[in-house]
């Protein structure tokens, strides 16, 4: 009986939209992390007045900061869409009490909880940039921290702790 539900879930049009939007969000966050780390390395090089090969081949700090915040904004948008689609999709499924995977799709599922935590982190990052004027190193560090949480959601939580997202 569980295989029937699994097949229905994987064949749902909501599945493709949910997964693709979340993967695009996580890819955007990965790009933001790389840009953030690049920003931090370039900042360190400039502060030490050691302008080597690394400096000559990179855009300015201002452009890196701009690229970082844009990657975060795009990722946040797709993360929001993916989470909303997941909620709508779950609410439309007619859950029979026999499938524990469907029963586990609540906020108590570690993967869902951490995905919402990622949304809070990146929401704060966008808020801090727009309302509090945070730029540069602060945003770069937040991008790096946020992506570390994304990786946490994929590796240990995705493989060992969640039950509803294992297909």
List each model region and its residues.
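Short, small-residue-biased leader/transition segments that mark boundaries at the very start
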Residues: 1-5
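Membrane-interface helix termini and inter-helical loops of multi-pass transporters
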Residues: 6-13, 93-103, 163-166
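Short aromatic-rich membrane-water interface segments that cap or initiate transmembrane helices
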Residues: 8-25, 62-69, 101-113
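Hydrophobic cores of alpha-helical transmembrane segments in multi-pass inner/ER membrane proteins
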Residues: 21-39, 115-126
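Juxtamembrane inter-helical linkers in multi-pass membrane proteins
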Residues: 46-62
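Alpha-helical transmembrane segments and their membrane-interface junctions
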Residues: 75-93
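Interfacial loop-to-transmembrane junctions
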Residues: 127-149
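Juxtamembrane boundary at the C-terminal end of a transmembrane helix
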Residues: 152-167
